[in-house]
């Protein structure tokens, strides 16, 4: 069940509606619901959705390439790419007149292993994809990296983004939507325990009572309101 985030979805739809190349940045602390928001947004769109991991440059390239092939040439497994430029060139040649969303989730994991990734991405946005209907979403949980390496004036990508979203915890009203049949008191308890963090709210079964749900929620870090 997807709950709330109407303003963020509207912003993303506005971003998507514009023709041409575009880039947006979504960031926020872990478990806040960034990936869920993006998944909801792209559910009816042609999308390459890659979630980077701490596995090194070569392995991220390999797995990203598979996601690209799955969109443009599903079922084809005998194509390999020896560089990120080769994958980006493949996207350029196959995008045609389609509008494609390109998501790189947990970007810092990859970019920290490949110092050239952001500058290569900047080159393609400026000179190669500039006439394509390609919508790029860069997402990350490492706030310092996203703010200093992606959003700051020192970033190769500075001036390229159309918008940005810093995703925060749900407020009380949106948190209450996860348990619509609860009393106001129990809704307040749920909000107080979860801090509006999407991951914890998603663990709640609205068919169970408050005590049953609280016994299922094991919060491993303190929440902040």
Label the predicted regions.
Residues 44-48, 58-77:
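Conserved NTP-binding/hydrolysis module of P-loop NTPases
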Residues 1-12:
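N-terminal pre-P-loop "Q-motif" helix
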